[in-house]
């Protein structure tokens, strides 16, 4: 089954593929449901069902066409940038030095199908992630340059940003879910050594 890197909950720092620890709690219901789903899958494995768990990070559009099937996550912040006045420099939520792990859907599909076809993958968990993610500030600088907009200027302190997004009605106004905002503020590295080993020789890498 497809779980998600968010099954690790509020844990920051280095997250191993076999980690499934709820001791740090969850920042939102998405993380909690990912954790619960993976726990159910692991119980099924203990019961004899052949299970391979795939944990992609934040999934974005096709790496060649950019096509997406829904507007969510980073695309909402891009939309906010595009609809702002062209000379307005929107501040970053947080200092912008957190690395945002994004993976294109075609990589997730190709890698997932290959790994799931390997008999040795049964009982294992694999992070499908970008091994060299960019910082949030660099990502939005590139978006600004590509769209002719002003790059982000300054930042809103992390505590202020999350508090503001808890204000009733403000999340809807900004159209940026708090769950995505929390990604921009959590410094985490997803270890993917098992996934890289499984993909060796297959010609499948995160672009």
What are these regions (language model features)?
Residues 1-32, 50-52:
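Conserved Rossmann-fold NAD(P)-dependent oxidoreductase catalytic core, especially the SDR/UDP-sugar
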Residues 1-3, 55-57, 129:
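Active-site beta-alpha turn of Rossmann-fold NAD(P)-dependent dehydrogenases/reductases
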Residues 6-7, 58-59, 133-134:
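Short, solvent-exposed loop/turn segments at secondary-structure junctions
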Residues 13-14, 42-53, 57-100, 105-110, ...:
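NAD(P)-dependent short-chain dehydrogenase/reductase
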Residues 28-43:
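Phosphate/diphosphate-binding loops
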Residues 80-95, 158-205:
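A hydrophobic C-terminal alpha-helical subdomain
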Residues 96-132, 202-205:
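Long hydrophobic segments that form regular secondary structure
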Residues 114-178, 197:
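Mid/C-terminal beta-alpha module of Rossmann-like enzyme folds, strongest
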């Amino acid at each position: 089954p497809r779980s998600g890197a968010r099954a690790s909950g509020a844990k920051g720092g280095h997250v191993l593929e076999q980690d499934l620890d709820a001791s740090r709690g969850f920042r939102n219901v998405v993380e909690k449901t990912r954790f619960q789903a993976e726990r159910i899958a692991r119980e099924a494995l203990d019961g004899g069902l052949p299970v391979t768990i795939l944990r992609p990070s934040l999934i974005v559009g096709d790496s060649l066409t950019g096509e997406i099937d829904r507007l969510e996550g980073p695309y909402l912040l891009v939309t906010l940038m595009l609809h702002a006045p062209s000379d307005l420099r929107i501040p970053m939520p947080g200092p912008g030095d957190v690395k945002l792990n994004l993976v294109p859907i075609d990589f997730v599909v190709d890698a997932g199908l290959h790994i799931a076809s390997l008999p040795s993958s049964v009982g294992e968990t694999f992070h499908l992630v970008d091994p060299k993610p960019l910082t949030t500030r660099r990502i939005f600088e590139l978006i600004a340059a590509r769209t002719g907009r002003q790059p982000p200027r300054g930042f809103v302190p992390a505590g202020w940003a999350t508090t503001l997004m808890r204000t009733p009605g403000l999340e809807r106004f900004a159209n940026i879910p708090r769950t995505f905002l929390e990604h921009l503020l959590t410094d985490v590295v997803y270890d993917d050594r098992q996934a890289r080993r499984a993909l060796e020789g297959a010609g499948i890498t995160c672009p």
